[in-house]
């Protein structure tokens, strides 16, 4: 019987799970997408864009990294927020390596301390990644403050600083350092896999990303998305039917906009993204529905995939 931790030519394989953690809006999802060279996680300038733990997979001949992009750790205000924090705690319990991303434009906040408290005692290698150095006035001084939050940590800790655009050489350096410490294991996913998300979940997240970019004030946080149907015509056209879910009828009108303008703009932007990544023509049909108080309704959360 062949050894699952060896390649066909007898080389030993290494693989492991790497959690990317940090407070909201520090660049975790952008870093994940940079590692993979493709988009598997939604990004936007707004905090709490990521709600689920998203797994992105990077495989070489002998190594496989399973990155776990996590929601920003924060003080939850509703059942959705509690779910998001649970995703972080679950990821940290099951991974081999931790990446803590911090924003060097600002000194540590209470939310950063929440993250530090989680990772300080974990006996796992940790990379402290100082992000957005090119936009920071005093990046070295800020890095010292974040480093101080890990005081007393006994497990191995390394540091790296990244520009806001995630310079490819900097990202490659960090990736090589992770590869060097992966444990000996068989691969967890097939070669060529980029993510464990279903295509429906991935498309729904792209729709939500575009909605978050377009909508104002607190409304983006009261929006969820799902894809109910995805079919392919003989000519290759991808027909995707999705829903944007809001909590109130007033919100529905705001998402649709005057004469349907806002909804059309969200749909057009999402369709363009989908066409680029799928390399196919896409028809995207969107409907706005109301599920009252869905962020506090555990059954509704499960129906929307937050489980």
Swiss-Prot record:
Region (G3): 69-72
Region (G1): 22-29
GO cellular component: cytosol; plasma membrane
Subcellular location: Cytoplasm; Cell membrane
Annotated KH type-2 domain residues: 215-292
Positions contributing to GTP binding: 22-29, 69-73, 131-134
UniProt-listed SUPFAM superfamilies: P-loop containing nucleoside triphosphate hydrolases, Prokaryotic type KH domain (KH-domain type II)
Region of interest (G5), ranges: 162-164
Chief subcellular location: cytoplasm
The keyword Acyltransferase appears for this protein: no
Keyword vocabulary terms for this entry: Cell membrane, Cytoplasm, GTP-binding, Membrane, Nucleotide-binding, Ribosome biogenesis, RNA-binding, rRNA-binding
Gene3D superfamilies: 3.30.300.20, P-loop containing nucleotide triphosphate hydrolases (3.40.50.300)
UniProt membrane topology term: Peripheral membrane protein
Location of the Era-type G domain: 14-184
Function: An essential GTPase that binds both GDP and GTP, with rapid nucleotide exchange. Plays a role in 16S rRNA processing and 30S ribosomal subunit biogenesis and possibly also in cell cycle regulation and energy metabolism.
Quaternary structure and interacting proteins, as annotated: Monomer.
NCBIfam families in UniProt: era, PRK00089.1, small_GTP
Protein name, as recorded: GTPase Era
Provenance organism: Deinococcus deserti (strain DSM 17065 / CIP 109153 / LMG 22923 / VCD115)
Gene responsible for this protein: era
